[in-house]
Amino acid sequence: MWINRLVKHPSYSVLRFYTKRLCTVSVKSLREFGVLPNSTICHSVYPRRTYVMGRAVINDILIKKSYSTHTVCAIDRSKDENNGSAYDKFEAKGIPIDVHTLKRIISSSGMDESEFSKSISYLFAKTVDPEPKDVLSLEDLSFLLNKLYTQRFQIRRICRDINAKYSEFWFKLFSLYAEKVDAKRNQVNLRNTKLDACEIFDANLMIKNFIELGQLGKAQKILSFILDRNPDILLSPKNADISTIVHFLQLRCGALAPYWKIPDNSEQKQGFLRKMVRLGAKNTSIRLSSTYKAMDHQTLLKIADLALQEKKLLNSEDLLSTLIQSFGHLGQTQILERCIEHIWQISPQEFPSHVVIKHRGCYPSSKILVSILVSFYFNDHDLHRGLSILDSFIKHYPDVKLDALFWRRLFQLSHFAWTPANDKKATSVVRCWHLMKQWYASKRLRPSVDYETLRQLYDIMKKTGNFPLGIDVLRSFKPGIERTRAENAGKVNNIIIKYQKCIIKELVNRGRFSAVREFIDNYGFDRKMTKDLNIFCANRMFLRSKKMKNKIENKKEREKVRLDSFDDDEDDGMIIGSLW
């Protein structure tokens, strides 16, 4: 989070910096939606300064920031917690932006800049400060931008309803923000045009949003906005910002693994080229751009050199993960192996390069292991080297936590690497399934339900006819499925129904009717589903009996035709014989 960057400055300089910045803001109290003690007015009062500063320390709570920087010292953390609590009270009691107001603002994104600016001022007055303002300050707009980001999913639904472009609304908002950033520097006639920590954080928040939308061109423009004003933000040990470096690696060095095109051997047909798929193609949480390519190879090596020397960069899980993906995308697997050995002392050989393992960077996480696995598969088109290194990590770092994304990627890659002509039963994928069960059993945990993992295993079950695998999957995920169904997850429910119908169909076709009844009793999950499965089972049994009946009748008909043909041949033989 951006306030962490200020730890390296003396406390008095930080206080002086923010005192100077916040003195330009009106200290007039703003009405909040709360209750003052011993008051009947039903409005509590906090100065604007309190919750502007408070916004800076609730990034991980309110904004759900998915990447972190170096650790804040204990003294600064205790001070920041007080500011955060004041802001949290404001947000807890505050009324979210209503739908009517959001529609008005989104509709105004098609207007010119002045009209859009007036609409944003109206939104601020409607939701934060009822005091009318002709022009919003940069701090007000920053606060509003973060508030809108927390409601981005609601904004997306509204955009669909009113047929407005969701990405255009956000880019219009950023354009207004960038204009105010430059106008502020022109007003005070600053020679140093560098963005401050708050502005860098806001810009990176917008980059993250556009990456999620698949709008990489807009994300590139915002990244250039940062780099033009802070040219040393990537390679300076003193001023390096982890969030900006991560986004640079993602946008310009290939560290967006969901965009990578992976060869799918399981769909290869004889005489045809292998089908190329993207890892994120089936993921609905992000949208993928139609094109993606890395552009800057030289800066990557400089960033890697800096990251391997700076402790604060080595402690960033997100930075190391994107660095690994960048090397993988550019085919630099030898450099990648040396980096892994330098940071975690794990080599591609069976044993680690040191007797005593002592990592120099952050403890290996699921995110880092996914990046290693995907990077090696992208270059080798085989899981052998990646799984060998993965096995060493699990052996020598027993506390590593493997989340749902890790297992999803493992099943995706093992499925893509599977060649049906050489392995009809998909034993490599089944082996990964048993590995997952053993890991969760060793940790005494239950596997979390993941749609893509279920879909990959369903495809394997259907292609190989391995219905015991499907039953085993439902048995292992049963507690999670029951919990997910209670939350009304439509996609998971649909894939579960596919499992059930496929297994019932296989059991009925094999005549195992008692096993079908037992399966429905164990995995019906609720009364309605059990009823539907019984109806489906009855239909399949009826179709099977009809098919068997037709098969018997056809067999009798063929036998009769054969006998009649034999009798005719015999009669012909007798006639020909008498003629001779």
Curated annotation (Swiss-Prot):
Keyword Ribosomal protein belongs to the record: no
Main location: mitochondrion
Localization: Mitochondrion
GO molecular function terms attached to this record: RNA binding
Transit peptide, residues from-to: 1-40
A GO cellular component entry from the record: mitochondrion
Pfam families documented for this protein: ATP13
The keyword Metal-binding is annotated on this UniProt entry: no
Keywords for this protein: Mitochondrion, RNA-binding, Transit peptide, Translation regulation
Domain of life: Eukaryota
Residue ranges crossing the lipid bilayer per the database entry: none
GO BP terms: regulation of translation
Function: Required for translation of the mitochondrial OLI1 transcript coding for the mitochondrial ATP synthase subunit 9.
Subunit structure, interactors included: Binds to the 5'UTR of the OLI1 mRNA.
Family from the record: Belongs to the AEP2 family.
UniProt name for this protein: ATPase expression protein 2, mitochondrial
Species of provenance: Saccharomyces cerevisiae (strain RM11-1a) (Baker's yeast)
